[in-house]
């Protein structure tokens, strides 16, 4: 809604600049501008109007180039306003308002660009790698319920997974607060364990971006309204271990082919449960995987994840359901994230897979 309102505002501001063109060309002698305008200035008024119109349209289309066009239009517009200050000084107000939105939008763009750059680095690192086929023999060291799960997921006789791109839509909340909607995109790379998660949440009527980065045991998390104001900023320490749990959770639920990884030590519990210890450098985390009779993974439970808000460790679980076929792989399309506090379980996240793709380039 606000996007349409702002685009209309910029568009109208651009149209108003045609008044200068009309004044110079004598098309309308009853314009609000009473001061004389030199004829060569007509082209500048016309160009400024077109820049604002183009910026408005590109803003609606979510094309980043609107930022550059807006800055150029504002500079030209303010130059023209100064040349006829007595009649056009009020035009400074919309220029300032548009500039404010440009600055805030540029901050968000720069913040997301950091994520995009890190994704490109990850993609470049595996560009020349050719994945081998995952075979039945690769499953033999795994506990039987894990073997059944990988067969059910459809990973056998398909390429090993080097990376995965996932798009989510869902909801999140904090304890004692209302749900807020979000969309997210993430890339995981598995040779050097990497998780790059970029989220856009709707909070307080605005889009609030968040970026989680995990690289080989080192984690950081930033949530920045407009990409400028640090609402949350955490790195290293207990976050490293907490996000190692998250990375392994992603492997189990979203990239089951990676469960043959040698950094995982498996222990069979029974026909429907298995325990795993996942180690990255000096960090080891433990999780229990729960399966049903047909081989589906239905829950992931770990006691090694920290709730960053209060720096305490609680049981963490992610029950999943609604298995669907994604490009030939059977994966859970819906999942929830729960903290198990002393007073009871609390669901803080609901995730729906919008799209998933392996070995992207």
Please report, for each region that a protein language model flagged, where it lies by residue.
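Gly/Pro-enriched, hydrophobic low-complexity segments
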Residues: 275-358
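Membrane-interface extramembranous regions
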Residues: 1-114
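N-terminal trafficking/processing presequences and adjacent post-cleavage segments
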Residues: 111-136, 218-236
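N-terminal leader/targeting segments and the immediate start of mature chains
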Residues: 115-165
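Short, solvent-exposed aromatic-acidic interface loops
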Residues: 200-206, 224-230, 303-307, 336-342
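Short, solvent-exposed coil/turn segments at beta-strand boundaries
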Residues: 161, 185-198, 210-221, 269-272, ...
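N-terminal mature ectodomain segment of secretory-pathway/periplasmic proteins
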Residues: 147-227
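Flexible, processing/modification-adjacent segments and terminal tails
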Residues: 222-280
